[in-house]
Regions:
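Bacterial N-terminal signal peptides that target proteins for export
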Residues: 1-9
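Bacterial N-terminal signal peptides
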Residues: 9-17
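Intrinsic-disorder-associated interaction segments
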Residues: 11, 132, 328-332
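N-terminal signal peptide c-region/cleavage motif recognized by signal peptidases
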Residues: 20-22
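N-terminal secretory/targeting leader peptides
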Residues: 26-124, 139-357
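Signature of the catalytic double-stranded beta-helix
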Residues: 126-140
Length: 357
């Protein structure tokens, strides 16, 4: 009887262990999205091909859990100006978006736009921005405190240039010309008396085609990907700088509800996604220029004198933005000074010395 009793206890313990093991192996389905499409927007491509793919594979390899992603890019769930709010509300679990479309809520996070003619290489720009985020943890903390999401990593637009319907050679040639852009970079146009028009990449082709505006401030990869070279074939290399203003975030409550080992993998892959973006976008810049040329765009480089003239016209812009940030109770001087110095530390030489005070 004792033997039978022991066997029964052993069977119960074994059964309980198996049930516990099965119960602890969960399956999670996440919604990840962006207002930009995969392909024409390289950061969305890496969200899908690297971030989502790596989280899925690492969770499967290193834990008992499984994850799957429902991928919703190109605005199928949230548009370019709605992704922050969609992650905040939980409509999306993960979102990738350009901070440029949140000029009010994320005013100071747009600091690279306020300091035009910054680092030309994406890898340098994202390294400088990482220093700024590390020196100013408020930039990440505010996303949690005010918008209910955890910042996973930075993405970057490669070096900005200008595409137009007609050729131009001097800053004066742009006076009165309507040019599209995304929020924070529009003042680059105002200071040379062009007429800035707030717009988005998805609507750009038709707007150029129909004459809503006759040019676009845009990186070559996106200018090519969205085929802007068809209605506006002149692409002039100016070098406004690469812009590390892409954010990848996750809903805070969703992240905290997950097993710790899954949380750790998500944070780990987010950091690696950021690390990959700089070098990847350096390659994208060259690929984009090559494809533009192949597709018939007329590419030229602006003269250094004209570039310096444009940079000098913007000399007061950083001071204005820093003061605006301070008036909102934000550490504008500290953050923008950090970026100026961090850019110098990666070897960048500013064409004009910006005075913030």
């Amino acid at each position: 009887m004792k033997i039978i009793h022991s066997l029964l206890i052993s069977a119960i313990v074994t059964s309980s262990t198996l049930i516990s093991s099965v119960a602890s192996a969960d399956s999670f389905t996440f919604r990840i999205g962006s207002g930009h499409p995969k392909g024409p927007a390289p950061y969305v491509t890496t969200m899908s091909d690297f971030f989502a793919a790596e989280v899925k594979s690492r969770v499967a390899e290193r834990t008992e859990h499984k994850v799957n992603f429902v991928e919703a890019y190109g605005g199928s769930i949230a548009g370019v100006a709605d992704t922050l709010e969609s992650v905040q509300s939980g409509i999306l679990d993960f979102g990738g978006f350009c901070i440029c479309f949140e000029p009010s809520k994320m005013f100071l996070h747009n600091f690279p736009y306020y300091l035009a003619f910054g680092p030309q290489r994406s890898s340098d720009a994202i390294a400088a921005a990482r220093t700024v985020y590390d020196e100013n943890p408020w930039l990440k903390q505010v996303m949690q405190d005010e918008y209910g999401q955890v910042f996973l990593g930075l993405g970057v637009w490669d070096n900005y240039h200008l595409g137009t319907k007609e050729d131009w050679n001097t800053v004066a040639d742009l006076k009165g010309i309507k040019i599209g852009g995304a929020g924070p970079n529009l003042p680059w146009l105002e200071y040379v008396n062009a007429i800035p028009v707030q717009s988005t990449l998805p609507e750009g082709y038709l707007a150029l085609k129909t004459g809503v505006y006759t040019g676009w401030l845009m990186v070559p990869s996106a200018y090519n990907g969205f085929k802007f070279y068809e209605p506006a074939p002149y692409y002039t290399l100016i070098g406004f700088g690469a812009m590390p203003v892409i954010a990848l975030t996750v809903n805070k409550e969703k992240l905290e509800s997950l097993p710790q080992e899954v949380q750790d993998i998500i944070l780990e892959v987010g950091a690696e996604w950021e690390a990959k973006n700089g070098a990847a976008m350096d390659e994208v810049q060259q690929f984009g220029l090559a494809k533009l040329k192949e597709n018939g765009a007329i590419i030229k480089t602006i003269s250094e004198d004209v570039r310096i003239e444009w940079a000098q016209s913007l000399a007061q812009f950083p001071k204005t933005q820093a003061a605006d940030a301070e008036s909102r109770g934000l550490p504008g001087l500290k953050v923008m000074s950090s970026y100026i110095e961090a850019s110098k530390s990666v070897g960048h030489v500013w064409p004009v010395e910006y005075d913030l005070e």
